[in-house]
Amino acid sequence: MSLDLSGAQLDQLRVFAGHLTNCCFDNASLLSTRLWGSAITDCTFQRADLRSSALGTGEWHGHRNTWQRVAFDRANLREVTFTAAVLDDCTFEKTSKQLMFVDCEIHDCTFTGQLSTLAIDGRGHRYPVDPSAISADFRDASVREFSIMGYRLDRVHLPRQEDIVVLHRYPTVLRNAAAWLKRPDATEAERRWSGMFDYTLGAPGAEDSDYCFDLNGYGDPELIAVASRALAHAHGASLT
């Protein structure tokens, strides 16, 4: 199906087993859209309003949502989730806050501009996913409160900013960092933040997977300093 729906009012759109090709949804209002088992190819959602939408909804009758060569540039993707979706050669430019990818396959996608509270979680707790199922380019992105967890990052070009931290085989590194913070001679600040990694360690990804994030996303200067020291010690411990 090929359609020009630019500027259309289509809030709470529901699509089951759809096949959309060469469709234009630029500047459309698509609040709380939901798709199941659908394939979207060569479509544009530039400046579309997709707030609170579920663009990946797991598996439906044996099929997942697939997005191939789709442009989401400057779309409002606030509180949008992709769960167990397959994305191939898609673009995301300055896509607002609280965009989340959970257990998706992400191939050759490009992220640019300011991106805030963007989380890419491949720990496989919602849907099985290969930790190598990601290749993406963030080199022209500026991120805040950003993370990629549970994937291997050898095919990911990360943002060019100094506060990006990359932890290879991150479960081991974080366990070492958590143990260091709880040592008997920890400082008062270290004791105060001793549980900072507990939530992440509560449901870790594969042992050989990675974790990257922007350190300044922690916000609190004391917390940033404590995290930096703990991770520096943990890196040394993980090599011994």
Where are these regions (language model features)?
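Long, ordered, amphipathic alpha-helical scaffolds
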Residues: 154-240
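Tandem repeat scaffolds
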Residues: 1-175
